[in-house]
Amino acid sequence: MEKRVEKRRIVLVPLPLLGHFTPMMQLGQALILKGFSIIVPQGEFNRVNSSQKFPGFQFITIPDSELEANGPVGSLTQLNKIMEASFKDCIRQLLKQQGNDIACIIYDEFMYFCGAVAEELKLPNFIFSTQTATHKVCCNVLSKLNAKKYLIDMEEHDVQNKVVENMHPLRYKDLPTATFGELEPFLELCRDVVNKRTASAVIINTVTCLESSSLTRLQQELQIPVYPLGPLHITDSSTGFTVLQEDRSCVEWLNKQKPRSVIYISLGSMVLMETKEMLEMAWGMLNSNQPFLWVIRPGSVSGSEGIESLPEEVSKMVLEKGYIVKWAPQIEVLGHPSVGGFWSHCGWNSTLESIVEGVPMICRPYQGEQMLNAIYLESVWRIGIQVGGELERGAVERAVKRLIVDKEGASMRERTLVLKEKLKASIRGGGSSCNALDELVKHLKTE
């Protein structure tokens, strides 16, 4: 009997956004340590900077057309349309070169054209979600809605506040639709994202202890294995990928601050802040009388390069009381003993990193999944304070004092430390995420 040849090459297809690219690379590193080799097809739109080091990764180029800016939904839809044919040609060429030695394709859930190509070429394929299981369940709920009826229903206050079935405390008005322009194109995107096609399983960068009910519901709805492998950034396989230049001078400044006194402010790699909001944030932080480390990314303030948009006297006080950088070594900062809280946009990567370092959060979400994460941080895990609506300095000051000075903040810190230990236990031998990774590897070897 002919011995079965074990396929060891895996094709990874990340979405070309930092918050999606980084965990996909961390997943790839985990699989490299399990004996697989990783191939990453990339076009001009998502080419990795050549200065970055990804040992064990093979990057290959696929031709693509120039994307037009049509907003987040339009750009994603366009990307999936224009990339399918060239990706298919790329995979066919790979199959010829590698002698069919391709174990599977693992693709970001928003790069769903890969699922169609894998189906046509009869290749095993797995969906990777860099967001929460709760977000994926919400996409399933949204995919079944009729846009016109939903908009009419949502005019009723009772409907807005109705809890989504088996999703307490999420209400229908909490479903992530508000920031994506017209509703129907967004619902159509949800339908494409939740269409599992021939996928063998779904891989999620989350942890069972954080989302057990959402994971159970997702498993029931999809009827294929769901592997929660998170937090990927703290597995032994993770190497702390970053594609932005970090300013480590802030660590020296942190060394001079009192324990748990500093508020770390970072709104991720994509959020755009208005000048007025920045001014209110600055005054609120100054009035709180707490030191702060503030990441102001170039281009993150509308019509300005950053702190220059503040009045001169305010800018001077900010530089005296706080420390400003363009980008920070976030995991190292969150793990520093002087950091007592994280003012965050509540992106999922930042949320996991904060919990792993035992740092409670002030939640200022801007769009989509961030809103869901903020609700869970405040109402389910009870380790966050949400600041909503139009930002004003008084709300900033109150939130900082609640977290750093009041007993409420101390209780949040205790709960965060409990979750920290649970998340770290999940990746150790016998932990839920460690077991899920082993099961995934076993699954990959049987495809």
UniProtKB/Swiss-Prot annotation:
Binding site for UDP-alpha-D-glucose: 269, 328-330, 345-353, 367-370
Species this protein is from: Arabidopsis thaliana (Mouse-ear cress)
Top-rank taxon: Eukaryota
Principal EC category: transferase
UniProt keyword terms in alphabetical order: Glycosyltransferase, Transferase
Family: Belongs to the UDP-glycosyltransferase family.
Coiled-coil segments: none
Gene Ontology molecular-function annotations: UDP-glycosyltransferase activity
Keyword Flavoprotein: no
This protein's name: UDP-glycosyltransferase 76E3
Enzyme Commission number: 2.4.1.-
Alphabetical list of Pfam families matching this protein: UDPGT
